[in-house]
Swiss-Prot record:
The keyword Magnesium does not apply. The YXXL motif is involved in determining the exact site of viral release at the surface of infected mononuclear cells and promotes endocytosis. Residues 497-533 form a coiled coil. Residues 280-301 have a biased composition (Pro residues). Residues 268-308 are annotated as: Disordered. Disulfide bonds join 77-129, 103-118, 104-114, 152-172, 164-177, 209-215, 332-335, 332-559, 362-416, 381-393, 423-436, 551-558. It comes from Cas-Br-E murine leukemia virus. The lineage of its organism: Viruses, Riboviria, Pararnavirae, Artverviricota, Revtraviricetes. The keyword Glycoprotein applies. GO terms for molecular function: metal ion binding. This is Envelope glycoprotein. Glycans are attached at residues 43, 199, 322, 361, 394, 430. Residues 32-267 are annotated as: Receptor-binding domain (RBD). The record marks 465-466, 645-646 as: Cleavage. A motif (YXXL motif) lies at residues 651-654.
């Protein structure tokens, strides 16, 4: 067999490839920016392109980012569409049937319009794709033990691979550039992103070619480095060459990733946050329908404002509390907390559902990371939970097998280290250090007894204790969905209470939506402000004065910047002036002794140091003489007593003598 134009023995190629493979592994970062919610599902499309970067094969699925790595199975001839002329498909349109006449049968062409007999011996002409007979010869080459094909990377190769050439050599200008393929020396690599091989056996390919179909399908699999790369949205390219006698024909192909959101998020109109700040709408009195046989036109309910949403939160909390414990609502006050955190979570132990395909709510993830700053209780945890949060776990599942989607029960959410989400991807959970806790959301509504409210209106002379307030999530009985559902066994109002709880959950869900819209509008406002500030209007207007100014030269709408920093400086100056006045007023009310401490810092230190000894000395001078006199008098009295005892010991008492008359 005649060697190729840059022929080397397979043994030499194996040694050189092994030497080059030790030089390192290429890690590619960048590309698609990481999204906020790693469990959110997107519409992902893997596209295989030809040398003109036209899509010739694609596969689509709904999965989280960087979790779906399917096998790509394009046909080798599809990669040659609009490619080099020697492949015979330079004018063949993509996504169409194979070109050319079919093969003839074994008996001298019984099929009308056939080209030649596929059972006859194949000549040494180069394999092509324009007829069934040529595609059959291509299949024989790609499956032959001493022939085949090899792949060379182009866009992501390391620096030492500069000798591999460019598009003219299909990135395979020298031996050692090949990283995968199906050839006699079995080319491999430890850093390339893909492996390529045949997807059919020789007999299966022969049968498909004789039926005038695409009969040279490849199977492209992603390697470990390829799954770690995040630059697939820009695309990567490779070269493919056949290993045959003479010059090795080749082509180039690419692989790229296309990501789109499942649901559109299109803002309409000006900033909706400012126009949405409306008070609670008044209820419209019900009117009887007019007597008419014509059907009434359904009316669209007005959009709720901020006041309506806040009132719905308090009303939903009251209805839930009233149906579960009516004694607490006979006389009470429910207050919606007006400062963060606005919500608190209660960990619950409930059963989730597992799905093989992504449900609809998995694509409705938030655009921003919402964090719960207060979570109580014990519930179900997934992933590797740190020690600081293990107190929230009643049951922990470190890993979840398979590649499924875990949907939280109705009325609950997964509180993860990456934010709140209604759906989890086990693939993301097992590949990352993320952990999640199943929680129920409760608005920060404070429960007050009537005594607390009454004391607020009593005279100020009465001493008021610090109020003991409880939020709904911290009430002794607990108002979680699990606790409400437990009342079904005892009858009573469990079903109605569950409906009230769901109404409260719906109110919280609407409020969270508005919070997300507010964050989005704030982001857009900051972006718009930064664009305005970056325009150096004054200087550029002078440069483009002949064209009518900067806006006329750029053909853009003029932007104007309202600078309020001067007002801020004036306010700060007035604040400093008031502080100085208060300081002078405070100093004028001090006595001369207090003023000494404010004049010099060393004087304060000196006084505090010698004050103790001076006080002790003063006390000694005042009370020392009196104490000394009393002590001397006491000693004299004791000495007099001792002297009297000594004198009495020298004399004896005489007994009286009685004389008889």
């Amino acid at each position: 067999m005649e060697g190729p134009a840059f022929s080397k023995s397979p043994k030499d190629k194996t040694i050189e490839r092994a030497f080059l493979g030790v030089l390192g592994i290429l890690f590619v970062t960048g590309g698609l920016a990481s999204r906020d919610n790693p469990h959110q599902v997107y519409n992902i499309t893997w596209e295989v392109t030809n040398g003109e970067q036209d899509t010739v094969w694609a596969v689509t699925g709904n999965h989280p980012l960087w979790t779906w790595w399917p096998d790509l199975t394009p046909d080798l001839c599809m990669l040659a569409l609009h490619g080099p002329t020697h492949w015979g498909l330079d004018n063949h349109p993509p996504y169409s049937s194979p070109p050319g006449p079919p093969c003839c049968s074994g008996d001298a062409g019984a099929v009308s319009g056939c080209a030649r007999d596929c059972d006859e011996p194949l000549t040494s002409y180069s394999p092509r794709c324009n007829t069934a007979w040529n595609r059959l010869k291509l299949a024989r080459v790609t499956h032959a033990p001493k022939e085949g094909f090899y792949i060379c990377p182009g866009s992501h190769r390391p620096r030492w691979a500069r000798s591999c050439g460019g598009l003219d050599a299909y990135y395979c200008a020298s031996w050692g550039c090949e990283t995968t393929g199906r050839a006699a020396w079995n080319p491999t690599s430890s850093w390339d992103y893909i492996t390529v091989s045949n997807n059919l056996t020789s007999s299966q390919a022969t049968k498909a070619c004789k039926n005038n179909g695409w009969c040279n399908p490849l199977v492209i699999r992603f390697t470990g480095p390829g799954k770690r790369a995040t630059s697939w949205t820009t695309g990567h390219f490779w070269g493919l060459r056949l290993y045959i006698s003479g010059h090795d024909p080749g082509l180039t192909f690419g692989i790229r990733l296309k990501v789109t959101d499942l649901g559109p998020r299109v803002p309409i109109g000006p900033n909706p946050v400012l126009s949405d700040q409306r008070p609670p709408s008044r209820p419209v009195p019900a009117r009887p329908p007019p007597p008419s046989a014509s059907p009434s036109t359904p009316t669209i309910p007005p959009q709720q404002g901020t006041g309506d949403r806040l009132l719905n939160l308090v009303q939903g909390a009251y209805l839930t509390l009233n149906m579960t414990d009516p004694t607490r609502t006979q006389e009470c006050w429910l207050c919606l907390v007006s400062e963060p955190p606005y919500y608190e979570g209660v960990a619950v132990l409930r059963e989730y559902t597992s799905h093989e395909t992504a449900p609809a709510n998995c694509s409705s993830g938030s655009q921003h990371k919402l964090t719960l700053s207060e979570v109580t209780g014990q519930g179900r945890c997934l992933g590797t939970v740190p020690k600081t949060h293990q107190a929230l776990c009643n049951r922990t599942e470190p890993t979840v097998s398979g590649s499924n989607y875990l949907v939280a029960p109705e009325g609950t959410l997964w509180a993860c280290s990456t934010g709140l989400t209604p759906c989890l991807s086990t693939t993301v959970l097992n590949l990352t250090t993320d952990y999640c806790v199943l929680v129920e959301l409760w608005p920060k509504v404070t429960y007050h007894s009537p005594d607390y409210v009454y004391t607020q209106f009593e005279p100020g002379a009465r001493f008021r204790r610090e109020p003991v307030s409880l939020t709904l999530a911290l009430l002794p009985e607990g108002l979680t969905m699990g606790g409400i559902a437990a009342g079904v066994g005892t009858g009573t109002t469990a079903l109605v209470a569950t409906q009230q709880f769901q109404q409260l959950q719906a109110a919280m869900h609407n409020d969270l939506k508005e919070v997300e819209k507010s964050i989005t509008n704030l982001e857009k406002s900051l972006t718009s402000l930064s664009e305005v500030v970056l325009q150096n209007r004054r200087g550029l207007d002078l440069l483009f004065l002949k064209e009518g100014g900067l806006c006329a030269a750029l053909k853009e709408e003029c932007c104007f910047y309202a600078d309020h920093t001067g007002l801020v400086r004036d306010s700060m100056a007035k604040l400093r002036e008031r502080l100085n006045q208060r300081q002078k007023l405070f100093e004028s009310g001090q006595g001369w002794f207090e003023g000494l401490f404010n004049r010099s810092p060393w004087f304060t230190t000196l006084i505090s140091t010698i004050m103790g000894p001076l006080i002790v000395l003063l006390l000694i001078l005042l009370f020392g003489p009196c104490i000394l006199n009393r002590l001397v008098q006491f000693v004299k009295d004791r000495i007099s007593v001792v002297q009297a005892l000594v004198l009495t010991q020298q004399y004896h008492q005489l007994k009286p003598i009685e004389y008889e008359p």
